[in-house]
Each structure stands twice: as structure tokens, then as C-alpha cells.
Amino acid sequence: MNIETIKSVYFVGAGGIGMSALVRYFLFKGKVVAGYDRTPTPLTETLIAEGAQIHYEENIDLIPETCKDKERTIVVFTPA
């Protein structure tokens, strides 16, 4: 995989301390970043303010269309 060909990154568990660092990294790299977390927190609100699209409902319709492109999107998740 070439990270330069990736357009968007979707995170499951975006509000975790390790995941949020990756969210910020990909935002810095200019990628479309979106994700899901169970509850809003000051950290997820900060990520939204920095440009991430985060939702708190388990609803596939809330995933941005750009993140549904299998060829140019990576999904990052944690078992935590």
C-alpha cells in the first residue's frame, strides 16, 4: 500500500488516545478523516474542530461517501 494514494481514513474508536494521535497525523497529511466513537468527549470535540468528521451513532449512513471508496480508503480499528 502506498499512503500517498490513500484519499481518506476512517477510524472505529476515534476518540482513544492512540487513535486520536493517528487521526491528527492523517489530518496533517491532508487526508479526509472520519470516524466513529461511542460517546462525545473533549478529545473528540477537539478532533472535530481540527477537521475530522466524527459521529457517535452506529449508523452506516453517517459514514462520509469519500470513506466508502474501497480503493482509496483505509479503515483503522482497535479491539480496545
Give the role of each language-model region.
Residues 1-80:
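N-terminal leader/targeting and accessory segments in enzymes
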